[in-house]
Amino acid sequence: MKVLVINAGSSSLKYQLIDMTNESALAIGLCERIGIDNSIITQKRFDGKKLEKQTDLPNHKIALEEVVKALTDSEFGVIKSMDEINAVGHRVVHGGEKFNSSALINEGVEQAIKDCFELAPLHNPPNMMGISSCQEIMPGVPMVAVFDTAFHHTIPPYAYMYALPYELYEKYGIRKYGFHGTSHFYVAKRAAAMLGKPEQDVKVITCHLGNGSSITAVKGGKSIETTMGFTPLEGVAMGTRCGSIDPAVVPFIMEKEGLSTREIDTLMNKKSGVLGVSSLSNDFRDLDEAASKGNQKAELALEIFAYKIKKVIGEYIAVLNGVDAIVFTAGIGENSASIRKRILADLDGIGIKIDEEKNKIRGQEIDISTPDATVRVLVIPTNEELTIARDTKEICETEVKLRSSVPI
């Protein structure tokens, strides 16, 4: 069985074609600058052979047509025809309160995704465009929506409710939802395997650190607390997002700077975080380099980022009543030894110690803690696409009859 995994953004479309017989990616690709000048599609095959093509991509439908062309290309492709694609798995950022698991896409599911547009205005509309475009190009192919929020549905009400008038929750669904769920789920499962323990006996804190960052407390394979909230703006400081701040700061800035609600939203989401503090960059490599050369604002930005995460780790150890492992994943979590070192410095009092040499190793699953540490520190590259493909396969095997004669 072959599953096409789609992650549609506002001007980009990431995809992977995964052969589920051995869970290997046959091709990984990206359409960039959709609806903008100088659009490009790049695709890398399992054997390293790479296609790069500049072409006009005015919308997501045209982009997906180019994806199919690339996958079936006589020189760079990996399948003979589109009929070899048995199912499509779509990443959908927000499932609201309706979805606690992945779902076979039908009219009801599509409407529920649209109902969440106001909860995730930057993400759900392009996710839906990806779904609609796929349905036009591949009619009859079963499609599954995998929600970023679904993993966090096990968070208890006392953790997800805000101390606001209850009717605001009843009227508008204002509560913590959490995000990056697919990533947190994957690495928590891998952590249990690396620890050699049954999933139900493991307590881990998973740190998904990228331009957007979130931390999750996972107990017995279930999310019981997470840093992102009603939107991905809540939580730790991030690349361009401020994270949690005193809410009274918002009207204060609006009044002083004469900003509209849209402008203050842009300021907090796109001009804050380490970019805002450093006045330099949201790329942590740039900040590391600048800090090493004495740039004090770059150093402060890195200190704030690490401190906020360290504080959450302490908080979540209390929430979990102890922890077996701290897990680092995503772009920064997997690749930045210096950030991991900053976060975990001076935590030996609670059993967290890292091996400096192991901490430098990149691109693989590894335990970087010292032998005498009582809490393991694991670096686990995330694989959201494989998780989406697995869910898609499982739902297709139980809920639909695949149209292809290719055996599952």
Curated annotation (Swiss-Prot):
It holds the Pfam family Acetate_kinase. Substrate binds at residue 91. Mg(2+). Can also accept Mn(2+). This is Acetate kinase. The gene is ackA. It is found in: Cytoplasm. It catalyses: acetate + ATP = acetyl phosphate + ADP. GO terms for cellular component: cytoplasm. Homodimer. Pathway: Metabolic intermediate biosynthesis; acetyl-CoA biosynthesis; acetyl-CoA from acetate: step 1/2. The keyword Phosphoprotein does not apply. The lineage of its organism: Archaea, Methanobacteriati, Methanobacteriota, Stenosarchaea group, Methanomicrobia.
